[in-house]
A protein has these predicted regions:
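An N-terminal, well-structured beta->alpha segment
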Residues: 1-30
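Amphipathic, soluble alpha-helical interaction motifs
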Residues: 11-18, 101, 163-166
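Internal, active-site/partner-interface "lid" segment
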Residues: 124, 137, 165-197
Length: 197
């Protein structure tokens, strides 16, 4: 187990924070429309979590499932939106089809791609590419189950969300306004005497 954790930690530590990361933050900070996240499979779970983290920290965002996009959910997008697409291979047909249709049919052309493979078609469809690194070693015994790659995606998405949070001077009271339930709601609650739990 220690070896698995070590390999995932190594993958995260190998992320190269380049100028593309700064460009991505600025693009999201100045997005005139909505921030949309998407991804398929395990990458989709990271995209969904990214939207949830952004929404609770001052950047309104939501997840669109790429398969459902072809069945009407593409209509949730509009021209000024910014899409953040997650795919290690950059070859997931559902993601590529969604991005192609969003561009052709709705004029949505602002895409940040989070991907690893050098020959990833997602790179060509993205205005900004956040490179996960080309040689991420999966600790899986048969080298197939995505875990280190997913850990890298999670780290990249958290870095974006928390940097945006800082740039927006997001406060504890701002957080509580969006997240008033549970433990985090209780520790960020102003001393009003009103119990929102």
């Amino acid at each position: 187990m220690k070896d698995i954790v070590a390999k995932e930690a190594t993958a995260i530590q190998s992320i190269k924070v380049t100028d593309a990361f700064v460009e991505a933050v600025n693009l999201l900070l100045n997005c005139r429309g909505k921030v949309i996240t998407t991804g398929m499979g395990k990458a989709g779970y990271i995209a969904h979590k990214f939207a949830a983290t952004m929404s609770s920290t001052g950047t309104s965002a939501f997840f669109v499932h790429p398969a459902e996009a072809g069945h009407g959910d593409l209509g949730m997008l509009s021209k000024d939106d910014c899409i953040v697409a997650f795919s290690t291979s950059g070859k997931s047909n559902e993601v590529l089809e969604m991005l192609g249709n969003a561009s052709r049919n709705l004029g949505v052309n602002t895409v940040i791609g989070v991907t690893s493979h050098i020959d990833s078609p997602l790179r060509d469809m993205s205005k900004i590419v956040l490179d996960m690194g080309p040689d991420i070693e999966e600790p899986c015994p048969i080298n197939t189950t995505p875990s280190a790659t997913i850990a890298v995606m999670l780290a990249i998405s958290d870095a974006l969300a928390l940097t945006l949070m800082e740039l927006k001077d997001f406060t504890t009271s701002d957080y509580h306004a969006r997240h008033h339930k549970g433990y985090l709601g209780s520790v960020t609650r102003p001393d009003t005497g009103y119990d929102e739990s």
